[in-house]
Amino acid sequence: MRQWLVGSALLESDDGLLLVANRRRDGNVDWTPPGGVIDDGESVLVGLAREVEEETGLVVTEWGGPVYRLDAEAVDAGWHMQVEVHRAVAFTGELRVDDPDGIVVDARFVPVEECSAVLASTWQLVHEPIAEWVAERWVDERRYRYRVDGDVRASMVITRL
């Protein structure tokens, strides 16, 4: 079973929550917070800072959290993913999109009241925890677990455990 660790960042400004548009292999685009796979030997925060800068041009100078951790297993597709989500307490730089992986095609601060609508096109395991955090702004770390059934992204069924 393929396993990987992903870091995800919650960056807020007066304009809202930072979301990036990801062009998937099938050509579809969905929105998520910035982040990505943590390289072997990297700490989550080092890898997450790298991903945020690569995808958005912003440099995080202080982290809080983790806000939540997520565990998702897709037995049919043969993968297991762990996600650690941190809040950027402070950051600098100008927002720009220049993703070396070519996945991120847009980035913007989305007003908080619009986040649920923008995130509706992405997986439940992405938008559900973010929607809950935006609504509640909890302090203590939370944990989420999901099972993903099926082996084709477009028809996978996601269940919160």
Predicted feature residues:
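Conserved N-terminal beta-strand and adjoining loop/helix that marks the start
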Residues: 1-18, 37-39, 69
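Acidic surface patches and DE-rich sequence motifs
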Residues: 13, 24, 75
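Conserved Nudix-box catalytic region and its N-terminal flanking loop in Nudix hydrolases
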Residues: 16-54
